[in-house]
């Protein structure tokens, strides 16, 4: 089995079970170290998650935290840098990030309507956003996860070998 990337996704009160399943599937595709499910985010076993994840919820390590801030604090103690994926003052465009392959990273994705909890944004080491040029200025959570994870995986040395 190939080694896991030093990369974790934190789902902060994501309400759609299809989004949760899709993130599991993407986490499996990029060999992430794990997924943290927080607050109202659904957790396996659930039929709706399984349908979208196609079983990836069994191949990706995951843990549940009632409070997303507790997840961030636990990951920080484990040596992770925390990035909120959110459009906030001071957020950096994804394409401008330069990551170190020797560092562990956690990406926090927020609720479909409210985004990342403000206390989590405040506790994050940085915020990153996907530049957008349309009128909506928002993407589906699982689509955002795929875009950001691709860039992080590429910079952290994801290989097809």
Where are these regions (language model features)?
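Post-transcriptional modification and biogenesis factors for structured RNAs
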Residues: 1-161
């Amino acid at each position: 089995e190939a080694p896991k990337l030093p990369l974790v996704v934190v789902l902060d009160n994501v309400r759609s079970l299809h989004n949760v399943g899709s993130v599991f599937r993407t986490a499996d595709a990029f060999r992430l170290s794990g997924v943290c499910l927080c607050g109202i985010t659904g957790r396996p076993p659930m039929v709706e998650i399984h349908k979208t994840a196609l079983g990836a919820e069994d191949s990706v390590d995951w843990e549940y935290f009632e409070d997303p801030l507790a997840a961030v604090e636990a990951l920080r103690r484990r040596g992770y840098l925390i990035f909120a994926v959110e459009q906030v003052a001071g957020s950096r465009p994804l394409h401008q990030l330069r990551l170190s392959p020797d560092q562990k990273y956690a990406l926090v994705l927020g609720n479909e309507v409210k985004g990342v909890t403000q206390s989590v944004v405040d506790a994050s080491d940085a915020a990153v956003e996907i530049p957008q040029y349309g009128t909506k200025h928002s993407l589906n959570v699982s689509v955002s996860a795929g875009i950001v994870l691709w860039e992080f995986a590429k910079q952290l040395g994801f290989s097809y070998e």
